[in-house]
Amino acid sequence: MNRPRVLLADDNEQLLERVAEHLASSFDVAGIAHDGQDLISKALRLVPDVIVADITMPVLTGIEALRRLQGTGLASRFVFLTVHREDEFLQACFEEGAVGYVVKSHMNPDLIPAIHSALAGKLFVSPCLSTGSSTHAPKSRS
């Protein structure tokens, strides 16, 4: 059985190396992007199963990259790996169709379960986040 393919996107090279190393035992890291435009190009070329991206990147944000990928026919699931804990970022990601939201400081316990959830079509939010009474549901992928 083929291992799921993951595309990583972040402008922090050291973090990308740590994430790739963390995922190597469970997933095939198909590629690495360093900004939002690079993310779009590589996603369309590599067609990964899951994209793990930062929100704050040069050229285009991760949210804008996801927005632009919508409607291209790309079926990749999107998981954000970010420092942002604010509810408005979480909401914006899910409104654009993301299925996962992981806080960078909780990457080790949360990222692999988030990717597995994404592959199963399920929503994942780092448990350290308190979403109050908000309900965050991913956008329909019809």
Report the location of each language-model feature.
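Short, flexible helix-to-coil linker/hinge segments that flank and couple to helix-turn-helix
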Residues: 88-95, 99-142
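Receiver (REC) domain active-site loop signature in two-component systems and cognate sites
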Residues: 57
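Two-component/phosphorelay signaling modules centered on CheY-like receiver
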Residues: 13-31
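Acidic di-acidic motifs
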Residues: 10-12, 85
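Conserved sequence signature across two-component system core domains
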Residues: 9-10, 33, 51
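Acidic catalytic/metal-coordinating carboxylates
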Residues: 35-38, 61-64
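Active-site beta3 strand of CheY-like receiver
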Residues: 46-52
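Active-site residues of response regulator receiver
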Residues: 54, 82
